[in-house]
Amino acid sequence: MEPMVAPVKPPRSYDSTERRRRAQQQHEITLRTARTLFDQDGYTATTVDAVAASAGVSAATIYKSYGGKSGLVRELCRRALEGDGPTPAQTRSDALRNSPDARTIIEGWGNLAAEVSPRVSPLMLLLRAAAVNDPEAATLLAEIDRARLRRMSDNARALSDAGHLRKGVSVHEARDVLWLYTSAEMYELLIVRRRWTRATFASFLTATMTALLLPIGSTTR
């Protein structure tokens, strides 16, 4: 009599799609939780352990996924810079460089700055406050500032190459004007302190950058 052989069970199918969905969902929860705690308690007082406990994950998971607290802020800043629309703000900004009309470019950049400032500037201001005593925050703040300055340099170069800059305005001067007027500090002064609306802020940025960068007589539509 032949020995009985237990039937071989087929391997369980592993739903990798569901796993990715759950991981992405947890990723979103973690980032929302971190943003809430940073806004509520500040950068220094918010700990990885606090974010982990509120998000329902382990601190080890946060360190593995983001590298720590500064990594959370870096990812939050990256997302904030995408803006409100389905197309990331930086992509829309790059596309504006191809416009033949300098006024359209400046107006578009002014609108984009007003769009992303309420999302990213509070994070920058948190880092600025923490950077005085926190080397990690200072390092991240400097990293983000350098990246923004490079981007403004690229924008200024695009204006110059297209012949849009007013005579006598150098690429470096244009870069610094763009860098200043799209800064978190400008957002803090006018929207946070003076309670300007986003629309008013956008109009101000557009009018001011037009007056400083474009040929005299250029006006926004």
Put a short name on every predicted segment.
Residues 114-128, 136-162, 172-176, 203, ...:
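Amphipathic alpha-helical packing segments from all-alpha helical-bundle domains
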Residues 69-71, 75, 86-118, 175:
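Hydrophobic alpha-helical connector segments
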Residues 48, 77-84:
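Short, basic, alpha-helical segments at the C-terminal edge of helix-turn-helix-like DNA-binding modules
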Residues 29, 33, 37-71, 75:
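Helix-turn-helix
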Residues 160-208, 216-221:
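Hydrophobic/aromatic-rich alpha-helical bundle segments in the mid-to-C-terminal region
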Residues 26, 69, 80, 109, ...:
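Hydrophobic/aromatic residues within well-ordered alpha-helical segments
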Residues 1-25, 217-221:
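N-terminal intrinsically disordered/low-complexity leader segments
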Residues 50, 98, 129-135:
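Helix-loop segments that flank and shape redox-cofactor active sites
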